[in-house]
Curated annotation (Swiss-Prot):
Function: Functions in trans to edit the amino acid moiety from mischarged charged Ser-tRNA(Ala). Has little activity against Gly-tRNA(Ala).
Subunit structure of this chain's protein: Monomer and homodimer; the dimer is less active in tRNA editing and does not have a zinc ion associated with it. Another report shows only a monomeric form.
Protein name in UniProt: Alanyl-tRNA editing protein AlaX-S
Annotated organism of origin: Pyrococcus horikoshii (strain ATCC 700860 / DSM 12428 / JCM 9974 / NBRC 100139 / OT-3)
Keyword Zinc: yes
Amino acid sequence: MYSIEVRTHSALHVVKGAVVKVLGSEAKWTYSTYVKGNKGVLIVKFDRKPSDEEIREIERLANEKVKENAPIKIYELPREEAEKMFGEDMYDLFPVPEDVRILKVVVIEDWNVNACNKEHTKTTGEIGPIKIRKVRFRKSKGLLEIHFELLELENPS
């Protein structure tokens, strides 16, 4: 069984994939993330507040991906090789220091690719249900904050 922080961190990747599916590639750049216990915040560069319908769809798609129990693959690769395989989309707005030569790249197939050195669950099903609690658009900075929490796992093993 994974710690709640590992599950919540893994949920960031699932939520991010849903955000990009619903809002488009304009929302692909992560500005910041935050995890504490079962609560997480994903902050992306974006130019507007999503509609209530879009927010519901992000939550629905994220939970669909959790139910799918998709594998979360981790590749540990030389930086140059990772950049050839995954391109700039694996990066966030906060840069990976230049002296880091080996990258861990988290891949949820056809959903999310991200250079990330944190621990993750092996599948999306191990994350548990995701509930979006608050969405805040900071117009002056062009940032969209998505606050979510993990609900209890239905069948913890």
